[in-house]
Amino acid sequence: IGAPYFNKVTKINDKKSGILFLPSLTLFQEMTENLKECNHLYLNKYWKLYEFINIDKKKLIKFKLFNHPRSKILKNLWLRKTNKSIKFEYRNYKGNINKKFKLTVIDNFSTPLFELIYNSYPFIIINDSKQNEFTNEFKKILNHLKSLNILFDSEKKAADFINKNYNDIDSWWNKIIKKKKFKIIKKSLFSIKEFNNSKFVNSFAYQLAKGDNKIS
């Protein structure tokens, strides 16, 4: 994952609205805790977040949930509990969902995180991981995200942030992407800003012609 994967995404400047819930934990249901969260509404962090958001805000905000096919149980629970006020997205999210929303909420450190950072789309993360399995370098990135008010360890804290800042998300985000810590994060994750396909193909062809299997 990196510049070769994301650099062909076409950016648009259309007016964005609403919040997209983009869960990744649904992709890892083999883990017991994740299985419980994916299929039990009251254990699901997106439901907790939705409940904590002010009633007045919920009347104004357009919510969409990117629902993984395996989460039919969760979908039915959402529809019943919200009186069908939340919409579901099923499209491939690469490059054509995040950019349409005022804010994206993710719950894991997987592909959506890298795409959002690469394209500088406004987002927050809700994750209470103890970070034991991460490298020291990635832990530094997570600490930067936390200090920028992008990473939250509880649904209540994330909801408080949304309640306070939703109307000014664009202004907040424009300040975030100019901050030194965000630039450090982006540089750490994407040392190559843009992937040069022609250069790669030419280099590959040259090495093949030489009979050298090492690509420079």
Whereabouts are the PLM-identified features?
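Residues at the C-termini of beta-strands that transition into short coil/loop
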Residues: G2-P4, P23, L65, N92, ...
